[in-house]
Structure formats: C-alpha cells, structure tokens
C-alpha cells in the first residue's frame, strides 16, 4: 500500500476523479511533451458523461492555459479497463508526436496505460486488515502506531496540515451563504444548520445538527471548488472532518489524539483503495461514501480508545450498510445527493462506533470480507448507476 499522502490529498474540488485526476494527468503529459504546438484531450466514459458538471474541461483549460488545446467529450466509445478514461495527444506541425491514455482511478490518483501500479512506492508490507491486526497484537501496538512505523515520524507534520485544511474548510463553509455554481440553484445550508438551533433543543438534536453542519460546510466548499482534503475522495470529503470536528470539544481531545485518529482512518481507506476501489465511477457511491463512513467510524473508535476488534467492526459495519449505494449525481454535479449524503454518513459513523462498543465480540463479518463484497457489488452495478448521470435520481430529475 502507498503512503497516506496519496489518500489524503489537499486540493480543490469538486471531484477528485474528474478534476484532480485529469489535472494530474495533464501536468504529467505536459512535462513529457512540453514543446508541441497543439494538444487534444479526449474524455471517455464517466469523464465524458459527467465532465461538464464536474468542470473537468475548465480544470484542464487551466493546465493548458496559453496553449492550443481542444477538449473532446466522447460519450460513445466504450471504456473497458476503467470508466474514467482519457487520451492526451500532442501535435507538432499537424503530426501526432505523442499520445498517452490515462485512467483516473479515484481519489485524485491516475495511472497511464500499461502501468500496473502508480508511480508511488508501496511502503506498507501488509495488505489486509487481518494481517495488520495480527501484527499489531503481537507487537502490542495500536493501528496508528503501525502507520507511524511504516510512514516515519515525519508523517505527523503532513497529518497536521491535513487537519488544518479540514478545519479551514469547515470554518469557511459555516460562514458562507449563497447559491452553488452549476445551474441547480442549490442554496448553501451549512451556515443555517450551524446557527439555527431550536428552542429547548435536545442534546441529540444538537449533536445531529452540528455534525451535519460541519459535513455540509466541507461538502459545499468542495462543490464550490474550494480547498479540501480527499477523505477518501472529493465527493465524500465532508464525513471524516465533520466527525472529528464534532468530537474534539466533546471530550477535549488534543490535536495529537485527532492526528492519531486520522492515521487510523487512513489505514482503513488505504486498504479499501488497495483491495477494492474508492471510485464512484468504478463501484458506485458505496465506494466513496461507504469508505468515508468507515474511515470516520475507525477514527472515532480510536479517539474513544476502543480495541482493534471494535475498530474493525465499526469500519466493517459502515461499509456493510452502504452496500449497493448508487452514484447518480444530478446533472453530473457533486451536489445532489452528494452533499446531504456526507451528513447522513457522518451520523451513521457515530452510530456504528456506539454499536461496535457493545457487540464486537459477537460479530460474524470481517472487514476484509466486506471490502471484497463491496468490490464485487460495485462491479455488478449497471453502468448507469456508476457516475454517468444516466440512471436513478439523475434520470428522474431530468425527466421531471
């Protein structure tokens, strides 16, 4: 598995696979072919069908600014290897000089055709939760300590930057009003949720309202193209920070404890990314929001100092009860149902932790098993339910 630096990516929304990934591919291509007088980018599959809503073309235009570049949306050519496929071509005096096919595999990660893995080195020797948990038990260490062992002590400075970026997104989100870009005329709601408490509000209502306000804040910032952290993707970036932000003052958790929780969450996200997928275009929203919920649950369980079995159960439950969740964004925008879904998943994460605290000893489903199940389920989903905006709510909304 790769470093958590490639899971927690600091960047701008609205989509890790449809903006951050293509931008990374374009920058890489330009480094390899800087002297062409004409470029062409051809988007296929989900990149073509929802690229306009995700502002893929706008993001690419920024990379190729000052150069002659044509962007083509090819919605007909099938994409067998990965639904997020793109070709970039370089021409000189009308002749093709270089052509590379890239796949945006989720979370801002891209690989070129023929590459078995990304260019990033694998630093984790173990690839399953079962192996990692056995290792940690033998050494009598917690999951975050295994992360530190593999990543080195310098990873804490990066995680500090991750946490600061998450908090900044929350702060901007709960202070900003207005309509989100894209044509849906969707009103920002985070500020309202944060400020509009009920008279004689119960503790339970306050808990849910604040968690949702924080999740909305980050997700709305993402939809507006603001700076966020993929956790594990842009579309699911609100869940982990919402849970951490809510819990920190509840028990006066220190920054060090929050960073350890984020390290624990990264292990969950990395295992899913390595053994399955975090891409909505590949496996539906279960791969994005399900993973985010599992990461948040694991992080919260670490804050509460639950044992490894309880952490595993909280993460497993979070995926299990998102199985089959479709990715059908209306008009290809990371707005409906994405923003609201982040809030629901944040609340679910805490529910999973509470249940795991009591029932971990009697569980029957393991984390590795549910990850495999999620991947199989995602592959079985019809393509119209995998970030193409051709089915589900996206279709019904268009027909209405």
Q: Language-model features: where?
A:
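Short beta-alpha connecting loops at secondary-structure transitions
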Residues: 9-11, 279-284, 329-338
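Alpha-helical support elements that line or immediately flank enzyme active sites
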Residues: 19-32, 241-252, 297-305
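Non-transmembrane, aqueous-exposed alpha-helical and coiled segments at domain scale
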Residues: 4-9, 23-47, 53-54, 82-84, ...
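Accessory "access/gating" subregions that flank catalytic or transport cores
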Residues: 167-252, 256-271, 277-284, 392-400
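Conserved phosphate/anionic-ligand binding catalytic regions in large, soluble enzymes, centered on
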Residues: 8-26, 224-243, 285-293
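Contiguous, well-ordered alpha-helical segments that form the cores/surfaces of helical PPI scaffolds
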Residues: 213, 217, 238-248, 263-271, ...
